[in-house]
């Protein structure tokens, strides 16, 4: 069987609110950490989200 190429990741808010999104990423195409600007409903603003591991 083929090895999994996509890995589940958690996008954690840099505002420190504890809010996160879950998504997948291709390990081969994007080996470095993701940084995306997404909406944080806790503070009701768009904020930078950093990649973290799912436990």
From Swiss-Prot:
It comes from the Bacteria. InterPro entries: Ribosomal_bL33 (IPR001705), Ribosomal_bL33_sf (IPR038584), Ribosomal_zn-bd (IPR011332). Keywords: Ribonucleoprotein, Ribosomal protein. GO terms for biological process: translation. One of its GO terms (molecular function) is structural constituent of ribosome. Gene3D superfamilies: Ribosomal protein L33. GO terms for cellular component: cytosolic large ribosomal subunit. SUPFAM superfamilies: Zn-binding ribosomal proteins. Belongs to the bacterial ribosomal protein bL33 family. This is Large ribosomal subunit protein bL33. The gene is rpmG.
């Amino acid at each position: 069987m083929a090895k999994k190429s996509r890995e589940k990741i958690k996008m954690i808010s840099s505002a420190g609110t504890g809010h996160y999104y879950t998504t997948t990423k291709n390990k081969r195409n994007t080996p470095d950490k993701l940084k995306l600007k997404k909406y944080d409903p806790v503070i009701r603003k768009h904020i930078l989200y950093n990649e973290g591991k799912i436990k």
